[in-house]
């Protein structure tokens, strides 16, 4: 391969010029044309920028550059999600303070991000671990507290004995801590929660209006998990106690033969008889070690123990044995379920294992297989006065009867729980609450924010919050009574920091408020948000919740933070498996960029993969892109020579010009439309076709229309520019055009140029292509029929046969159907 002039030196040259000329500075005066483009901000880990960062930021930047050329005032900020467990664990291992390691990593990553040539406007940077940011994270906590949306309660939490901290459900993978792989246990702790369940219905409803991937919307729908049913009361035999079960199938109530409580349910200790106490205690210990995900697994064999107590069936008065089982969660519904083994697979499995009675109360309609367990709707049997009703009718009528007796009510239930936001760790934003023996819970007054995270802290994990041991931090005067009090020793989950960061970027220097209300309502919502699908049920849900809360508190006038969402796929190792150091298949962007320049790397990421899917890395693929860039460079040199010594020229648009013009406008149209859908691989394929057409015109047309030719070359460099920014800027300069290609208007396609005078159609006989013909694009159906029938190559297939019909697909084909 010939040496290219394009290299890393060209990258550095243009990055310096862009920086000096402030090419990408956002102009607040043009807010009416704003387009807010945002990628999920990175965690500042110690390693260099990896391929995942590149795949997120490079292609999105290309889209943003195109939008800028289309006349949008693009707001494209960047920052760092800088609190969190990794820096603290690193500190425990190395003794380097989390603040120091985090800030050093940020400086490294800033430099690397600049070297990517991405159009971030660094004036708007935010870093979540700095007091000027977390002051406002604490302010948001206080606003939720004032609104009754932040509260404390005792809760069984996932506890990692090794990390010595609470884990969210999502951080427990197969019963183990996702960070260190230790088996997770359960622990009762008083924790802070945000009441996200208060917004469950709106979070569900508004999903329909969002331009988000359907799969992500479905994940949120399932996570919120709305079910409409009823709560039915069961009294406990021989005691003045009762409990409620939530069910969506009240029509099966007559089939209940036992009830199950969650092992953690508060009634368990009150109702267990002496004979069964030991077994119940043992089982409770066993259940503690299971994660919720394991407990709900359909593969897992169902287990449980009898408490010795009985409940009274609310309709029949029968005694039903009360069991405890780990497949019932105290945090879902009421923590109690009725066992209807005839009509529920899980209950059937449980009843069969423990020899509990199984009753049929629903039969199928028509010839369906209604062998037990029969879980579909049907007709009620063995159900007293409700026998003969349909399931749909009975599930309402049965509840109405019980409601009249004060034993039931209709109820909507959600699977989603409130968001646990407190962490027993050091490296996070302190919770702005004071505990006073006299006054109870006292919020820190706004004027005293931020509650600063002290630097000199022992953060070795002991199971208690590290801040608890820091007397200077903990001891404080109560703002209400002036007496001695203690600060809350916990810190906020890092997902709280990232649940509002998109609101801070446009007003990141504001020290009076988190953001100016008037300004933020002009700048938001985010128009295009790009990041990993793994955040579907955490960050993306939390951000929607916080936006809605701030709207209801009067700070925002929009409902949703991110109008349009794109997920990038994953680039795998060359062996097709996920990249990991242990597999030795990690691709380091730096090595390739040194060799080829960042634009070749960027182009390969966009051309070699479907953006939302990703796929395995290929060295051959990046070499092919390097050859393509080289080919473009050679073409530009050739064109410059031709322009200097054109020989004989013309002004007419003849067939060769019309053909090149067609490819030009076809390319502009499809690059514009495909890039807008983040289908970069097909957009770049169209650009490659235009390069072929330019070479053809250069090499085969003796007398050229130089004015037209130059226009096409200009358009070509403009549409290549977002995808290969440094290289295109260099070519633009070499062509002698004024700086910068990114200040040019994005080309528009002309539909007229896409209408060809002559087009090629296929001629088929009985659906098989037998010939092709050049025909006028405006030919009538009758003319097309005659052209097809008189085609020499087709005639032999028609000899002696009866023509039944002729099918014409305009501009595509003629199909002659014969006997």
Curated annotation (Swiss-Prot):
Single Gene Ontology BP annotation: leucyl-tRNA aminoacylation
EC number: 6.1.1.4
Motif ('HIGH' region): 42-53
Catalytic reactions of this protein: tRNA(Leu) + L-leucine + ATP = L-leucyl-tRNA(Leu) + AMP + diphosphate
Key words of the record: Aminoacyl-tRNA synthetase, ATP-binding, Cytoplasm, Ligase, Nucleotide-binding, Protein biosynthesis
Molecular function as annotated in GO: aminoacyl-tRNA deacylase activity; ATP binding; leucine-tRNA ligase activity
Ranges spanned by the short sequence motif 'KMSKS' region, renumbered to the chain: 578-582
Pfam families from the UniProt entry: Anticodon_1, tRNA-synt_1, tRNA-synt_1_2, tRNA-synt_1g
Keyword Nucleotide-binding set for record: yes
GO cellular component: cytosol
UniProt-annotated location(s): Cytoplasm
SUPFAM superfamilies given in the database record: Anticodon-binding domain of a subclass of class I aminoacyl-tRNA synthetases (SSF47323), Nucleotidylyl transferase (SSF52374), ValRS/IleRS/LeuRS editing domain (SSF50677)
HAMAP family documented for this protein: Leu_tRNA_synth_B (MF_00049_B)
Name of the protein in its database record: Leucine--tRNA ligase
Taxonomic lineage from the root: Bacteria, Bacillati, Bacillota, Clostridia, Thermoanaerobacterales
């Amino acid at each position: 391969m010939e040496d290219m002039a394009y290299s890393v030196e060209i990258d550095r040259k243009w990055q310096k010029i862009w920086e000096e000329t402030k090419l990408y500075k956002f102009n607040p005066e043009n807010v009416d044309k704003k387009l807010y483009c945002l990628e999920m901000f990175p965690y500042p880990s110690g390693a260099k920028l990896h391929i995942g960062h590149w795949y997120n930021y490079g292609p999105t930047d290309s889209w943003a550059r195109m939008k800028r050329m289309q006349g949008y005032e693009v707001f494209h900020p960047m920052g760092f999600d800088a609190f969190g467990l990794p820096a603290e664990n690193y500190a425990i291992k190395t003794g380097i303070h989390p603040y120091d390691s985090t800030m050093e990593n940020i400086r490294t990553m800033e430099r690397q991000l600049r070297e990517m040539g991405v159009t971030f406007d660094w004036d708007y940077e935010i870093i979540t671990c700095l007091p000027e940011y977390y002051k406002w994270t604490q302010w948001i906590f206080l606003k939720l507290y004032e609104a009754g949306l932040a509260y404390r309660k005792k809760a069984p939490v996932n506890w990692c004995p090794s990390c010595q901290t609470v884990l969210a459900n999502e951080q427990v993978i197969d019963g183990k801590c996702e960070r260190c792989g230790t088996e997770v246990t359960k622990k009762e702790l008083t924790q802070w929660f945000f009441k996200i369940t208060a917004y469950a219905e709106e979070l569900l409803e508004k999903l329909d209006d969002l331009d988000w991937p359907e799969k992500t919307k479905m994940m949120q729908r399932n996570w919120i998990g709305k079910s409409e049913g009823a709560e039915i009361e069961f009294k406990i035999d021989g005691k003045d106690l009762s409990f409620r079960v939530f069910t969506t199938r009240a029509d099966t109530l007559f089939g209940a033969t036992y009830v199950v409580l969650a092992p953690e349910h508060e009634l368990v200790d009150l109702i267990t008889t002496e004979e069964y106490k030991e077994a119940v205690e043992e089982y409770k210990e066993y259940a503690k070690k299971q994660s919720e995900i394991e407990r709900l697994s359909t593969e897992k064999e169902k287990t449980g123990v009898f408490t010795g107590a009985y409940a009274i069936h609310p309709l029949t008065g029968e005694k039903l044995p009360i069991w405890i089982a780990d497949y019932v969660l105290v945090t879902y519904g009421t923590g109690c379920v009725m066992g209807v083994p005839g009509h529920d697979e899980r209950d059937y499995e449980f009843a069969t294992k423990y020899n509990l009675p199984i009753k049929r109360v629903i039969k199928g309609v028509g010839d369906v297989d209604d062998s037990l367990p029969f879980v579909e709707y049907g007709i009620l049997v063995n159900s007293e006065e409700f026998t003969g009703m349909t399931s749909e009718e009975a599930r309402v009528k049965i509840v109405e009867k019980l409601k009249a007796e004060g034993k039931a009510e209709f109820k909507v239930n959600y699977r989603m729980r409130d968001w646990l936001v407190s962490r027993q760790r050091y490296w996070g934003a302190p919770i702005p609450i004071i505990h006073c023996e006299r006054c109870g819970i006292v919020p820190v007054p706004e004027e005293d924010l931020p509650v600063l995270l002290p630097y000199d802290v022992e953060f070795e994990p002991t199971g208690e919050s590290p801040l608890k041991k820091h007397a200077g931090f903990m001891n404080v005067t109560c703002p209400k009574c002036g007496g001695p009090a203690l600060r809350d020793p916990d810190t906020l989950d890092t997902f709280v920091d990232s649940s509002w960061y998109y609101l801070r970027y446009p007003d990141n220097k504001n020290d009076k408020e988190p953001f100016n209300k008037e300004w933020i309502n002009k700048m938001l919502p985010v128009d295009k948000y790009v990041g990993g699908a793994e955040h579907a049920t955490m960050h993306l849900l939390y951000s929607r919740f916080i936006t809605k809360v701030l709207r209801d508190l009067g700070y925002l006038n929009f409902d949703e933070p991110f109008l349009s969402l794109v997920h990038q796929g994953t680039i795998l190792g060359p062996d097709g498996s996920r990249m990991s150091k242990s597999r030795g298949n990690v691709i380091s962007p730096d090595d390739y960029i040194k060799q080829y320049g960042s634009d070749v790397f960027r182009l390969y990421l966009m051309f070699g993969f479907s953006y939302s899917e990703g796929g395995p890395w290929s060295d051959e693929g990046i070499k092919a892109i390097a050859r393509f860039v080289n080919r473009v460079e050679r073409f530009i040199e050739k064109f410059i020579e031709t322009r200097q010594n054109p020989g004989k020229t013309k002004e007419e648009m003849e067939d060769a010009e019309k053909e090149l013009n067609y490819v030009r406008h076809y390319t502009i149209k499809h690059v514009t439309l495909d890039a807008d859908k983040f289908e970069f691989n097909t957009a770049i394929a169209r650009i490659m076709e235009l390069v072929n057409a330019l070479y053809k015109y250069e090499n085969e047309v003796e007398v050229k229309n130089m004015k037209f030719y130059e226009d096409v070359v200009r358009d070509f460099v403009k549409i290549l520019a977002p995808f290969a920014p440094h290289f295109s800027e260099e070519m633009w300069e070499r062509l002698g055009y004024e700086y910068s290609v990114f200040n040019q208007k994005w080309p528009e396609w002309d539909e007229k140029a896409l209408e060809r005078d002559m087009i090629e159609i296929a001629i088929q006989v009985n659906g098989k292509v037998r010939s092709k013909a050049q025909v006028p694009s405006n030919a009538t159906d009758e003319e097309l029929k005659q052209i097809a029938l008189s085609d020499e190559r087709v005639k032999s297939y028609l000899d002696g046969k009866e023509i039944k019909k002729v099918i014409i697909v305009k501009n595509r084909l003629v199909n002659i159907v014969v006997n």
